[in-house]
Amino acid sequence: MTCDESLYRQYLSGDDEGLNALMKKYGDPLTLYIDGYLHDVHEAEELMLDVFAYLFTKKPRIRDGGFKAYLYKAARNMALRHKSKRKPLFSLDALADEPDGRLLAEEVIRTEERNRILHFCMDEMNPDYREVLYLTYFEDMSYAQAAEVTGKTVKQITNTVYRGKESLRRLLEREGITNAQS
């Protein structure tokens, strides 16, 4: 049993500190993951709270070693449901946020600029590639955990990670980021 499962069991046995610890640990990363679907951090924060509210009220049984995958799968399902119900909005502010695409070489060297470019390229990627790369690299999930979250097989995750990395490499090269600058 991992630390997450023991904290969840602690909560199930009546100690709210277990759930508080899980919310501290996963609140921000889960919000970022949900924001990848909704592209609205405020809605993502609300949905993250809904995920934990679901755990709080339903108290589902979660198999050993599967808490993180269960949490992200629940977040994914809620985000997709929420996104399908949401009305499309057009915002003039969003147009002002568009990157100009022309970056000077000296700006690229700075970490903040490279991170901005990385996020820009990730946003342009196929959503399946983006999700699997996010889960495996940013959330440090195994391929098996990512497969459980997305409902795919481990082989499909392996292929998607490979294709996603190739796609990201091409997008980064287009923006002037190469392996030599990493």
Task: Describe each model-derived feature in a short phrase.
Residues 1-29, 36, 123, 170, ...:
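N-terminal module of bacterial RNA polymerase sigma factors
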Residues 73-92, 111:
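Arg/Lys-rich amphipathic alpha helix in sigma70-family domain 2
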Residues 27, 31, 52, 126, ...:
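C-terminal flanking helix
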Residues 80, 144-174:
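DNA-recognition helix of helix-turn-helix
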Residues 95-123:
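Acidic, proline/glycine-rich intrinsically disordered inter-domain spacer in sigma factors
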Residues 12-13, 39, 49-66, 85-87:
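Sigma70-family region 2
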Residues 11, 30, 34, 44-55, ...:
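Short, small-hydrophobic-rich alpha-helical interface motif
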Residues 132-136:
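A short pre-motif secondary-structure segment
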